[in-house]
Swiss-Prot record:
Location within or outside the cell: Cytoplasm; Mitochondrion
Cofactor remark: Binds 1 Mg(2+) ion per subunit.
InterPro entries: Adenylosuccin_syn_GTP-bd, Adenylosuccin_syn_Lys_AS, Adenylosuccinate_synth_dom1, Adenylosuccinate_synth_dom2, Adenylosuccinate_synth_dom3, Adenylosuccinate_synthetase, AdSS_2_vert, P-loop_NTPase
Organism, as annotated: Bos taurus
Reported regulation of activity: Inhibited competitively by AMP and IMP and non-competitively by fructose 1,6-bisphosphate.
Binding positions (GTP): 39-45, 67-69, 336, 362-364, 444-447
One GO CC term, this protein: mitochondrion
Pfam families: Adenylsucc_synt (PF00709)
Name of the protein described by the UniProt record: Adenylosuccinate synthetase isozyme 2
Domain of life from the UniProt record: Eukaryota
NCBIfam families in UniProt: PRK01117.1, purA
Binding site for Mg(2+): D40, G67
Length: 456
């Protein structure tokens, strides 16, 4: 490798230059797929498309609170913890250190999908789990339920969590009392002692919590034997993948930008970073290896559970979107709240993530409308505000300024090219591109793989 020569004499640094050559680190780039709204945008479908020729598909954050649905050969597979790209028999699936793993949930999910079709045959041979990933225990899930109950009793409203133990396990992680995959597979005796301490801590915080410590450990020992062959040093694995022969590496974000612990509509968020920064911290890789960042955007907006939702349509429009879009959560089965597309929210998500292109999904759900509204600005006390408010009370008070566009009022589900879309549907897509200054790469007009129109 030839290095560019440096000349210490002409250095612009105040103390001269050490004379070492400076080169930008090379290696493969990862392609990232992230949710740009409140989740349920159709990330699984975009990942499924990209995973067809990928070598490695990764999850970097969250747990089995996420829900992705992928349809292959008319079989519908549901994923919560496993990267949905594992459905490709040539893919290595990697669960990074930022993911929290509920072992019974992992095996149950795999077994359910194995029974549905051939997509998951031999999954254990193609899954790698970072040894630094934290473990979700049953008592984390039980505590999650108790916390929700307490919030309901004390404040009259809960956070609407999935009760999968996500908040409690990330709390244990931050409090440095959590247990990781490396603890489980390295020394079960030491792991058992630390498990007992953590379980007893939880029992003292939640007196109604019942934990069968010995029974749990017995089960965990069984899981340990099954999981051990899959556990590897995740940092080393990914470094080798990035710096070895050319590979297509895909990162499948869970949840979405507005559910991010830092940038989402706090406190009605998840407990991890589901923006692009979570890719680096959740996999153990530097930012210069991040390549394309695809934002997945539903053609309208949905949200599960409570929290501010400026463009929500609590009326016939919202009901029509809910019914036509079959808007029920994959993980909880809860009805999703529905509203018009919100470009203020998307501009904010773009500021954080730097999307290189968008996938616009479920455009066909808007087929019935003669006119379609798009939120283009927020007003507070009659004045347009230039930012997305952090405070939930403020966000609840904003008045949305809409742009009304003509609908197409025709079935677009059989369109396979952009030109086959009605002119008003084309204009809707172009309007979004112009307002956000991000190109739309895919348009979803139905459930199947074939119904994703690729523009470039």
């Amino acid at each position: 490798m030839a290095f560019a020569e440096t000349n210490p004499a002409t250095s612009s640094l105040p103390n001269g230059d050490c004379g070492r050559p400076r080169t930008r680190p090379g290696g493969n780039r990862v392609t990232v797929v992230l949710g740009a709204q409140w989740g349920d945008e159709g990330k699984g479908k975009v990942v499924d498309l990209l995973a067809q020729d990928a070598d490695i598909v990764c999850r970097c954050q969250g747990g089995n609170n996420a829900g992705h649905t992928v349809v292959v050969d008319s079989v519908e597979y549901d994923f919560h913890l496993l990267p949905s790209g594992i459905i490709n028999p040539n893919v290595t699936a990697f669960i990074g250190n930022g993911v929290v793993i509920h072992l019974p949930g992992l095996f149950e999910e795999a077994e359910k999908n194995v029974q549905k079709g051939k997509g998951l045959e031999g999954w254990e041979k193609r899954l790698i789990i970072s040894d630094r990933a934290h473990i979700v225990f049953d008592f984390h899930q039980a505590a999650d339920g108790i916390q929700e109950q307490q919030r309901q009793e004390q404040a009259g409203k809960n956070l609407g969590t999935t009760k999968k133990g996500i908040g409690p396990v990330y709390s244990s992680k931050a409090a440095r009392s959590g247990l990781r995959m490396c603890d489980l597979v390295s020394d079960f005796g030491g792991f058992s002692e630390r498990f007992k301490v953590l379980a007893n801590q939880y029992k003292s915080i939640y007196p109604t919590l019942e934990i069968d410590i010995e029974g749990e450990l017995q089960k965990l020992k069984g899981y340990m034997e099954r999981i051990k062959p899959m556990v590897r040093d995740g940092v080393y694995f990914l470094y080798e993948a990035l710096h070895g022969p050319p590979k297509k590496i895909l990162v499948e974000g869970a949840n979405a930008a507005l559910l991010d612990i830092d940038f989402g509509t706090y406190p009605f968020v998840t407990s991890s970073n589901c923006t692009v920064g979570g890719v680096c911290t959740g996999l153990g890789m530097p930012p210069q290896n991040v390549g394309e960042v695809y934002g997945v955007v539903k053609a309208y907006t949905t949200r599960v559970g409570i929290g501010a939702f400026p463009t929500e349509q609590d009326n016939e429009i919202g009901e029509l979107l809910q019914t036509r879009g079959r808007e029920f959560g994959v993980t909880t089965g809860r009805k999703r709240r529905c509203g018009w597309l919100d470009l203020v929210l998307l501009k904010y998500a773009h500021m954080i993530n730097g999307f290189t292109a968008l996938a616009l999904t479920k455009l066909d759900i808007l087929d019935m409308f003669t006119e379609i509204k798009v939120g283009v600005a927020y007003k507070l006390d009659g004045e347009i505000i230039p930012h997305f408010p952090a405070n939930q009370e403020v966000l609840n008070k904003v008045e949305v300024q809409y742009k009304t566009l003509p609908g197409w009022n025709t079935d677009i589900s059989n369109a396979r090219t952009f030109k086959e879309l009605p002119i008003n549907a084309q204009n809707y897509v172009r309007f979004i591109e112009d307002e956000l200054q991000i190109p739309v790469k895919w348009i979803g007009v139905g459930k199947s793989r074939e119904s994703m129109i690729q523009l470039f």
